[in-house]
């Protein structure tokens, strides 16, 4: 008995960011002006809306080129491989590319590390597109099932599109120690650790960035325009939207979330996110470096990559750190037992949480 299942691009449409990437490729539009690596800017970027709005027209332009047609076909081919467990198709990618993933909660120094990783390899980070280097793609997160959305399928499809972009963007690069190196800021890697571990390859390198939750929270609300006047949680930017999403996923009622103190909501998000590091399969990969937020520690990590890629006199950009440890002393008291719980959970899977360094409060 044979059953034939047909899915079209109506059920599985191509992602707008993939279309935007391919448009640059097929029309030889240079990638330039990328701002994902800016340490100091607190501006919330809105380029995503433009990409979505322009996607229908841009898709026509991409499909008018054979190269664009081939890339979209390749992405669907890889999606089928992921859906059906075609291990050999994925193994070919694993044997060619070596992924270095920078993983951590937002505002933990991951953008700096990713940018300097690219610089250590000779790239101008402003010419590396956001979809290649930074957060958001491939997609992963708390499970969603609603009209037109199955987040597990979304993870598979965006992974297929990401791998297609990796082949296009990095495929002709010179290998280092036998493989082509692909740096990626993978904020969402904790939500599906086993998935990223198995698909990107068991030899993948992970760099985990960790920061004190009070400092992370301050940086988050500053990104969104400041602490709300009433001190209550509010959604004004992407990070706060992820806080809302994650808390609702684990049982917080939306009405109750609006009444929560800003730091209480953020602290719960911080705790959950760092639990995922230990509980979703990410820890199965033992090529993990853990770096606690601090100027010297961050710069030392980057210098090691400059040495590794042949620069004997590395001059990485300085990592900017601002001392705000005099703010919110009551928050520090609330955070201490949470930090210790995370440390204990990490220990259950053999990960050493940098407790002493985190308690410095940076």
Enumerate the predicted regions with their spans:
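PAPS-dependent sulfotransferase catalytic core
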Residues: 1-167, 228-259, 314-362
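PAPS-dependent sulfotransferase catalytic domain
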Residues: 5-8, 15, 189-315
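Alpha-helix-centered segments that form part of catalytic cores
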Residues: 79, 84-89, 165-178, 250-276
